[in-house]
Amino acid sequence: MKVYAPATIANFGPGFDVFGLAIETPRDTVIAKESDDFRIEVEGYKVPENDENVALVAAKALFKLVGEEGGIYLKLKKGIRPKSGLGSSGASSIAGAVAAARILGVEDDEIIIRAALEGERKASGSPHGDNVVPSYYGNFTIVESLNPLRVHNIEVDFKVVVILPSVEVPTSEARKVLPKKVPLKDAVKNIALASSLVLALKEGNLEEVGRLLEDHLALPYRLSLVPWFPKVKEAAKEAGAYGVMISGSGPAVFALGENLKEIGKAMKEAFESFGIEAEYWVTKVGRGAKWC
């Protein structure tokens, strides 16, 4: 059995730990079969091939949640670069959880998500759902609550340009720099931005969505980890981008607009001015985890 889980853009501007967007490219793939124990092999980007692997952690968690014994063999084709800001651990966790669910005949979304969150906990230290939820459901997702699971899904149809520089930002490190408290005016601003962004998405107003891609809760405190972002954003805007933002905790950046290839080229040149190599691609919105 084979499971595909797409990369994701977490936060999507003002929706810290709440908003997420699945993208079609890249993705992780898991080939799974029943086994007497829990084992994993990995192809592609280098990640652990033992109990530290988040796909295996998620698969084990699902077995435990439903009270099943036994095991599973996973072959993970790692297509999403770790520490990229594109939900690498979230996609692997969803792939592992879905694989275990299909083998055991589990169809309960909440159990699958809860198992995948254990993979995210392993990777980043906290079970945040803004990567695993869109990777599972696809489209644009809003995580209202994880316990109980309350998720809202908005079907959207547009393309984004994503650029990934040759630097890493571990999610665990990016979360450490965040303050315990933020100014009330910043919280109010993000609520206004997030509410307006959801409305713009529902109306299909991509230019307005781009304008609302701001963040006053996390990005100001993370700029020390992504010091090149203001210049990359400026280059994208000059090339015609509606909006530009860090994907997740970075370093990946995404932009909305019409001339996406030109925007990607402009961002690449901006990265190169810092001596940083980067690759960009244009992708559609992803439709969630799939299996066959």
Curated annotation (Swiss-Prot):
Catalysis: reaction(s): L-homoserine + ATP = O-phospho-L-homoserine + ADP + H(+)
Sites where the protein binds ATP: 81-91
Gene3D superfamilies from the UniProt entry: 3.30.230.10, GHMP kinase, C-terminal domain
Keyword NADP: no
Keyword Transcription regulation: no
Signal sequence, start to end: none
One protein family per Pfam: GHMP_kinases_N
Record keywords: Amino-acid biosynthesis, ATP-binding, Cytoplasm, Kinase, Nucleotide-binding, Threonine biosynthesis, Transferase
GO biological-process terms attached to the record: threonine biosynthetic process
Compartments it resides in: Cytoplasm
GO cellular component terms attached to this protein's record: cytoplasm
Pathway(s) annotated for this protein in UniProt: Amino-acid biosynthesis; L-threonine biosynthesis; L-threonine from L-aspartate: step 4/5
InterPro entries according to UniProt: GHMP_kinase_C_dom, GHMP_kinase_C_sf, GHMP_kinase_N_dom, Homoserine_kinase, Ribosomal_Su5_D2-typ_SF, Ribsml_uS5_D2-typ_fold_subgr
Chief location of this protein within or outside the cell: cytoplasm
Enzyme class: transferase
Documented EC number(s): 2.7.1.39
GO MF annotations, alphabetized: ATP binding; homoserine kinase activity
Function: Catalyzes the ATP-dependent phosphorylation of L-homoserine to L-homoserine phosphate.
Entries under HAMAP family matching the protein: Homoser_kinase
Family under the similarity heading: Belongs to the GHMP kinase family. Homoserine kinase subfamily.
The protein's name in its UniProt record: Homoserine kinase
Species lineage: Archaea, Methanobacteriati, Methanobacteriota, Thermococci, Thermococcales
